[in-house]
């Protein structure tokens, strides 16, 4: 379809908002595009709000625990919703758009309807697009957006706890990764302790991210240092690819993190 913008002024940028279904889950997309996953199946995101999806996830979690009796710690990576992250084929500019604090990927038709039923008003696309500023962590959220965050957080905790309880019932500990699909987990929210997680893991580029992990109460803290053992680093550097320098990358990240380590309560690195 065609959208016509009227009254446009020179040198101004305009956005057209729309709701789309993403068929290709973005972590799978990232690894295929940057790390050449080849014939590995393209994964699709699921909507955990539907009873059928929840039943499948509970069955899968139970079956996994049954088949892996020797595993003592289960890492959730992380819960159900990822931040906004899009990749493209251009080798000179892989990252199309990323917003680590964005709740845009939580906007399914069912969630929007349930929110309106609970709060008495509807979210609009502009509440998420925010005049093109979007909703990254350095932007103060609106009252409506904070209500949406609370709405999602309540659901993620209530259903997520069921999966964690399954892990605990098999005598295993449950850790959560404070990165991929972390949206709705909100480790600094008042509800986080209701999950029952035993530990929190975070991959870190710098001291700020190290403190972000260590500041969460009631869990074991674990840092995961960069670079990852992938050909391409998360910021596009060819760490383990031809022309890369993993020693230099590791040294740079270590320098950025080490001062913060002196003041943190950490158990694992």
Give, region by region, the residue ranges found by the protein language model.
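Short, low-complexity, polybasic intrinsically disordered segments
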Residues: 195, 199-200
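Polysaccharide-binding and catalytic clefts of secreted carbohydrate-active enzymes
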Residues: 1-194, 212
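Structural motif
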Residues: 77-78, 177-181, 202-206, 225-228
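An N-terminal assembly and electron-transfer interface module characteristic of large anaerobic redox
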Residues: 89, 99, 243-250, 256-260
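Active-site clefts of carbohydrate-active enzymes
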Residues: 22-46, 216-247
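Acidic (Asp/Glu)-rich catalytic clusters
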Residues: 66, 192, 210-220, 261-262
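ATP/nucleotide-binding catalytic cores
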Residues: 72, 172, 248, 254, ...
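Conserved small/polar residues in nucleotide/adenosyl-binding loops
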Residues: 268-269
């Amino acid at each position: 379809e065609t959208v016509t913008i009227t009254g446009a002024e020179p040198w101004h940028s305009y956005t057209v908002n729309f709701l789309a279904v993403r068929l290709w889950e973005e972590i799978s997309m990232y690894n295929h595009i940057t790390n050449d996953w080849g014939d590995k199946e393209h994964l699709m995101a699921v909507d955990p709000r539907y009873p059928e999806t929840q039943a499948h996830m509970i069955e899968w979690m139970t079956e996994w625990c049954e088949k892996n009796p020797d595993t003592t710690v289960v890492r959730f990576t992380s819960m159900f919703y990822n931040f906004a992250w899009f990749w493209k084929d251009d080798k000179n500019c892989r990252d199309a758009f990323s917003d680590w604090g964005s709740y845009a990927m939580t906007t399914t038709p069912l969630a929007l309807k349930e929110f309106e039923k609970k709060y008495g008003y509807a979210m609009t696309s502009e509440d998420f697009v925010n005049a093109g500023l979007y909703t990254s962590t350095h932007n103060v959220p609106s009252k409506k957006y904070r209500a949406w965050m609370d709405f999602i957080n309540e659901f993620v905790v209530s259903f997520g706890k069921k999966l964690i309880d399954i892990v605990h019932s098999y005598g295993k500990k449950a850790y959560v990764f404070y990165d991929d699909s972390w949206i709705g987990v909100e480790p600094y929210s008042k509800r986080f302790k209701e999950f029952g997680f035993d530990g929190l893991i975070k991959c870190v580029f710098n001291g700020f991210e190290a403190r972000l992990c260590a500041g969460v109460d009631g869990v074991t803290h674990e840092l995961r240092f960069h670079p990852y053992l992938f050909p391409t680093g998360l910021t596009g550097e060819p760490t383990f690819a031809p022309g890369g320098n993993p020693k230099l990358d590791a040294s740079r990240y270590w320098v950025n993190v080490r001062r913060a380590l002196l003041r943190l309560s950490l158990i694992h690195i």
